[in-house]
């Protein structure tokens, strides 16, 4: 659905929340990591779907959920990295888990629709 700028007291709570979060996302846009985190946290704004998805376990609808660990972690910190990956697998809300871009982190609970 198209979200207008004007706040509407007769609209549903979720519609008004979407309006507020969309404006917040626009305000955060110059700080890409913050706007991306806000989108992952809330599911708003509704973004255009990905046309070509070459991501490993990344949902076309939900998009990238987290950054993967850098290669240096695998070579220089493998013990702690494996412990962290096991936590990701155990606590993932989407049952994908592991060190992939599609793994939901602990605070990423609202699914993007």
Q: What function would you assign to each model-found segment?
A:
Residues 1-113:
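C-terminal functional modules
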């Amino acid at each position: 659905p198209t979200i207008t700028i004007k706040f509407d007291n007769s609209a549903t709570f979720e519609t008004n929340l979407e309006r507020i979060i969309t404006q917040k996302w626009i305000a955060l846009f110059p700080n890409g990591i913050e706007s991306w985190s806000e989108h992952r946290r809330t599911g708003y704004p509704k973004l255009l779907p990905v046309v070509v998805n070459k991501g490993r376990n990344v949902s076309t609808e939900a998009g990238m959920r987290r950054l993967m660990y850098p290669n240096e972690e695998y070579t220089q910190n493998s013990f702690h990295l494996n412990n962290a990956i096991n936590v990701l697998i155990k606590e993932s809300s989407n049952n994908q888990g592991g060190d992939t871009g599609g793994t939901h982190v602990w605070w990423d609970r609202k699914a993007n629709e």
